[in-house]
Amino acid sequence: MKNTLIDDIASLARDMGEVRLMEVCGGHTNTVMRYGLRDVLPKNIRLISGPGCPVCVTSQRDIDSMVELALSGVPVATYGDMINVPGTKMSLVDAQNLGADVRMVYSIDQIIDEKDRVFFAVGFETTTPMTAKLLSAGIKVFCAHKVMPPAMRALTQEMRLDGFIDPGHVSAIIGSDVWGRMDIPLPQVISGFKPDQLLHAIFILLQLIQNKEVRVVNDYSEIVFPNGNTIAQRMIKETMKPVDADWRGMGTIPLSGLAPIDPLLDARLIYADLFKDIVSVENPACRCGEIVRGLVEPKQCPLFGTVCTPEHPQGACMVSDSEGACAIAYKYGKSLAE
């Protein structure tokens, strides 16, 4: 990390009060904790981790629905981390241990010919094009995809924030121009994932805040273009439609999710009778819902590092060690303490 950049941030921050900046990308959260960026920032610059982990924000009911579907005898598949997320009664891996046909995949190509299998689709705009490919191939999908900009707008109505570090990979899909059209009343900087890139984004945000400028700066222009990935956007538009979506800890956010356009490929509709009586209950001691909103830090959860570890997660935030705030904090906090 460049000391001159750290010094420049300190110089700007000297004449400012408390500044609350939120990153909303699991990759950014990983970099922040791995390299201890909070420790090199002035004390009045607070860096808050937001809902950047798709596994973490997937609702309890969606997980319970997939467990119920698997236990009923329907073959299901999903990406690796999702099978370990605890549901009300069990996780998908628990259902697998009871004999359910649950397949963990690393690529959609592993199941693109399996017409009888339901894919549990989770992720932000970055992974949505792969689900679009499955739908085009006639694979049934239980769609829990989330769209990031509406969630960020919702956060500004709930808590005091001074600026956003926008997600780089999401921005590469949707394009930098989208952020300026989303009615988010805060300065935003699209950033890469290296420590110096994040520090530079913070420096630009402080300049914008100091100058009272509410605009979007693309500081990752080698990857993110104004119109984004138009091929991926077209694939999504041809197979999916915007819908209201439930986020863990944030409730229902209008038009923040996606659903298959074809009702014959929408597992929520196909198996609606199976899902209608599901009663989902979250662990009352788990604070994952507050953590994804940036209201508390992982170590403020009473379960963190005691009964809740990556080997035995009690909540979704402890599952993904690449994007989950609790799993990342446990991983690097533990390594720093050793």
Spans of features found by a protein language model:
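A conserved active-site cap/scaffold subdomain adjacent to cofactor or substrate pockets
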Residues: 142, 159-225
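Short amphipathic alpha-helical segments
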Residues: 34-35, 131-133, 177-178, 203
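Short, hinge-like loop/turn segments at secondary-structure boundaries
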Residues: 66-67, 94-96, 157-161, 207-208
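Internal helical hairpin/lid segments
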Residues: 200-290
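Active-site histidine-anchored catalytic micro-motif
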Residues: 114-121, 126-167, 173
